[in-house]
Amino acid sequence: MAQADIALIGLAVMGQNLILNMNDHGFVVCAFNRTVSKVDDFLANEAKGTKVVGAQSLKEMVSKLKKPRRIILLVKAGQAVDDFIEKLVPLLDTGDIIIDGGNSEYRDTTRRCRDLKAKGILFVGSGVSGGEEGARYGPSLMPGGNKEAWPHIKTIFQGIAAKVGTGEPCCDWVGDEGAGHFVKMVHNGIEYGDMQLICEAYHLMKDVLGMAQDEMAQAFEDWNKTELDSFLIEITANILKFQDTDGKHLLPKIRDSAGQKGTGKWTAISALEYGVPVTLIGEAVFARCLSSLKDERIQASKKLKGPQKFQFDGDKKSFLEDIRKALYASKIISYAQGFMLLRQAATEFGWTLNYGGIALMWRGGCIIRSVFLGKIKDAFDRNPELQNLLLDDFFKSAVENCQDSWRRAVSTGVQAGIPMPCFTTALSFYDGYRHEMLPASLIQAQRDYFGAHTYELLAKPGQFIHTNWTGHGGTVSSSSYNA
């Protein structure tokens, strides 16, 4: 008999926790896993005493669902998603809903949306952020796809999502086709940027100011009471304080080689593809790549010389505040770039994205959750057509207030030989964005010189001109510009 409100396939920890979260909010969930024994284990242990039901086959699972049937896939992105869809389609009716809650590539989601729409099935690709704890007690959810599905899943999704402010859910409809997974991808890219910025602040504290672990932990705790109030700053303080079983701090013992699952890389690739200068996320990805060359770096450290022993002789408290402001200003740049990419994607794909709503979705339940995101929502509330966060009065003033400190932190770090790829690229972007004139005129002249690619004159935009730079070349009369 149909009794379940929704089914979930994939009983890894995230799947189990999402099921328990839905159960807590009064929804009856049917659990299924490819390895069927996992269903029995889950019902006998974690789900014991709940209303969760299990199924031993996909056919049984579908038979237990109320119509329209709602099925969440929480399996490994890629082929596994397509395999389950292929098995589910013959068992479903027109108007039934399949939701992919994994870290799928947004183009795959768009393809699945179109394929399933032709078969009468409503497909949703939803970003899910917040990790295992978020899944259990309130994630950030970013659903997109076939909007006809939204009225049938809205109550469940907004019910289980994290809440902020006066109980606003960190979940709303994002947009058509792959929009939900694109927004999740950008979220993950921003997460890479936030983490790298914090690492660079930590590096300056440790190697320029010579601060001890507990001293740095206290600084991050203090910063968490300022504009930087966020989950990542909070856990950084906890990590710095944490002691191993031998009573010594754990962090200095951890191998400095950062892993990555690839979602930050996807964001950087998309930025290149759509011609958006998302420089900070790109540098954050490359910083992880460089960190992974541990053995090479050990060899290089013995052969490549940097500045002579740097001795900081300034005011320590004042420079610590410079680092904090540099971190805040760089964070603003990172989010400005992330929203530039969202805006360009919306143009490319014809999506109508609610940028303030996206900021609210990230305000709680996810890894980048912070008070700062509320300010972004406010900016888009003031001007839904805002071209760039830096042009909003609040963020313009915030960056101006940080600018002197930002430049001091970066220049001091450079003099000390500290790698700060994200601090420096953020500052370079800011300086580039605020310059009416950039030296790209020389690039255009060079391109025309060696390849007759033509250029425009400031006084005659839209007219493409070729110059015979050497006296040996020809002329270009065509106004087509394709290089």
Swiss-Prot record:
Family annotation (PROSITE patterns): 6PGD
Function according to Swiss-Prot or TrEMBL: Catalyzes the oxidative decarboxylation of 6-phosphogluconate to ribulose 5-phosphate and CO(2), with concomitant reduction of NADP to NADPH.
Protein species of origin: Homo sapiens
Major site of localization recorded for this protein: cytoplasm
Classification lineage: Eukaryota, Metazoa, Chordata, Craniata, Vertebrata
Matches recorded under SUPFAM superfamilies: 6-phosphogluconate dehydrogenase C-terminal domain-like, NAD(P)-binding Rossmann-fold domains
Keyword check for Zinc: no
Record keyword Manganese present: no
Family from the record: Belongs to the 6-phosphogluconate dehydrogenase family.
Enzyme Commission number, as recorded: 1.1.1.44
InterPro entries xrefs: 6-PGluconate_DH-like_C_sf, 6PGD_dom2, 6PGDH_C, 6PGDH_Gnd/GntZ, 6PGDH_NADP-bd, 6PGdom_BS, NAD(P)-bd_dom_sf, Pgluconate_DH
Coiled coil segments of this chain: none
Active site: K184, E191
Modified residue annotations for N6-acetyllysine: K38, K59, K309
Residues the record lists as Phosphoserine modifications: S57, S129
Gene Ontology biological process: D-gluconate metabolic process; pentose biosynthetic process; pentose-phosphate shunt; pentose-phosphate shunt, oxidative branch
Protein name (Swiss-Prot/TrEMBL): 6-phosphogluconate dehydrogenase, decarboxylating
Keywords: Acetylation, Cytoplasm, Gluconate utilization, NADP, Oxidoreductase, Pentose shunt, Phosphoprotein
Catalyzed reaction equations: 6-phospho-D-gluconate + NADP(+) = D-ribulose 5-phosphate + CO2 + NADPH
Annotated Pfam families: 6PGD, NAD_binding_2
Subcellular localization, as worded in the UniProt entry: Cytoplasm
Pathway: Carbohydrate degradation; pentose phosphate pathway; D-ribulose 5-phosphate from D-glucose 6-phosphate (oxidative stage): step 3/3
Record: residues binding substrate: N103, S129, G130, G131, H187, N188, Y192, K261, R288, R447, H453
Subunit and interaction comment: Homodimer.
Any GO MF annotation of the entry: carbohydrate binding
NCBIfam families assigned: gnd (TIGR00873), PRK09287.1 (NF006765)
